[in-house]
Amino acid sequence: MRTNPLVLGVSALVEKNVGYIAQIIGPVLDVSFSPGYMPNIYNSLKVQGQGTAGQEIQVTCEVQQLLGNHKVRAVAMSATDGLTRGMTVIDTGAPLSVPVGGATLGRIFNVLGEPVDNLGPVDARITSPIHRTAPAFTELDTKLSIFETGIKVVDLLAPYRRGGKIGLFGGAGVGKTVLIMELINNIAKAHGGVSVFGGVGERTREGNDLYMEMKESGVIDEQKISESKVALVYGQMNEPPGARMRVGLTALTMAEYFRDVNEQDVLLFIDNIFRFVQAGSEVSALLGRMPSAVGYQPTLSTEMGSLQERITSTKKGSITSIQAVYVPADDLTDPAPATTFAHLDATTVLSRGLAAKGIYPAVDPLDSTSTMLQPWIVGEEHYETAQGVKQTLQRYKELQDIIAIPGLDELSEEDRLIVARARKIERFLSQPFFVAEVFTGSPGKYVGLMETIRGFQMILSGELDGLTEQSFYLVGNIDEATVRLNSTGK
């Protein structure tokens, strides 16, 4: 049996609390420590040594279980290739800590808070542990307020709550990334806020594409990196489950610093929240826990709650979270999406049909929902306008079959008017984005909520029945539609 170096009485080692690897099962390590020197749950452990090929090894693990017999079970945050039994393991005495603050903006990090963008080291003087309790109830800002995004379809029909959680549903190629980048741009310009993007268990190519598009659109400023509007944290598909399970907490920790210390409004993007659950399920099985429904971890609700409850508004600032939600096999009753839905305040659904028509953002106005769309929260005027828009679009949807076969001429005069207004509304829900200027050549538009409401009221009332549909396509506020008519004469 290997002697624990701690027992040898070497003072330098005693100070650091050293153990050794007793067993390795994939990304899970069992580590032996001396009696009385056991690390705490969630403590960060560092494995140091030389691999079988002579390469230097530095692996960080997180303690998950205390097994008895002076052993702990830990999950590795990086590949365990080259590790052997008997290797030295140092207990850092604290949970994993990551850099926070302005130094993180414009940079890409891994789960450990290490920069992975080849732009040199990060100023890590200010760090914060990734495991924290949610803010106390007395610190919360319980006032219900709308988070204005400047995007017409979102603000009118499925408004976001300040400090709320929003689910973003959409397949490939319907504009999720562009919508995310526009939100990052708008919070920076209109609210003086910053954003943190957590790539959880998605494709490495997508992470790279997002980074390149952010640089191209100016969200990340290569010349003045500190003036960038977003910090990126990636734990992609090829990472071990421990990294994918914790990368969301790393991103959240960076966002919490901007909220609590800088007192800013923060947008936190998590893509994809399902992968967070999936990674937790893998780790749970590796730790030997009995699986629950559909093979998920028995601690599913607890893990989801501990992440989601930290995303909230306090009296200092807010974290508003937008989470892409993958629904396995389109089954909304699957425990992973079902547990996520319990925490969401709004859903933004992107439609391939609208994208095919060229209407961007391709947000489905009838499928997207929000708990904030209540008359006592948004006001009677906003609520009535939103309901009028939805009723008009719903009637248009019901008439589609008649329009497709016999044609518009078979409709009553009233229905023809509804169809004409619905088509104008559909086009007015489109909007030129700031981050898409480089692709479209059209200058981006931020539309305030009152301007949005006024525009849709004018369409619903019939004031603009004389304008063509094309006048409403890709404009900002309603005045631009009338100006376009006068300038083109159409």
From Swiss-Prot:
InterPro entries: AAA+_ATPase, ATP-synt_VA_C, ATP_synth_F1_bsu, ATPase_a/bsu_AS, ATPase_alpha/beta_chains, ATPase_F1/V1/A1_a/bsu_N, ATPase_F1/V1/A1_a/bsu_N_sf, ATPase_F1/V1/A1_a/bsu_nucl-bd. It catalyses: ATP + H2O + 4 H(+)(in) = ADP + phosphate + 5 H(+)(out). It comes from the Eukaryota. One of its GO terms (molecular function) is ATP hydrolysis activity. It is an enzyme of class 7 (translocase). PROSITE patterns: ATPASE_ALPHA_BETA (PS00152). GO terms for biological process: proton motive force-driven mitochondrial ATP synthesis. GO terms for cellular component: chloroplast thylakoid membrane; mitochondrion; proton-transporting ATP synthase complex. Its EC number is 7.1.2.2. ATP binds at residues 170-177. It holds the Pfam family ATP-synt_ab_N. It is a peripheral membrane protein. It is found in: Plastid, Chloroplast thylakoid membrane. The keyword Glycosyltransferase does not apply. Keywords: ATP synthesis, ATP-binding, CF(1), Chloroplast, Hydrogen ion transport, Ion transport, Membrane, Nucleotide-binding, Plastid, Thylakoid, Translocase, Transport. The keyword ATP-binding applies. PANTHER family: ATP SYNTHASE (PTHR15184), ATP SYNTHASE SUBUNIT BETA, MITOCHONDRIAL (PTHR15184:SF71). Produces ATP from ADP in the presence of a proton gradient across the membrane. The catalytic sites are hosted primarily by the beta subunits. Belongs to the ATPase alpha/beta chains family. HAMAP family: ATP_synth_beta_bact. F-type ATPases have 2 components, CF(1) - the catalytic core - and CF(0) - the membrane proton channel. CF(1) has five subunits: alpha(3), beta(3), gamma(1), delta(1), epsilon(1). CF(0) has four main subunits: a(1), b(1), b'(1) and c(9-12). This is ATP synthase subunit beta, chloroplastic. The lineage of its organism: Eukaryota, Viridiplantae, Streptophyta, Embryophyta, Tracheophyta.
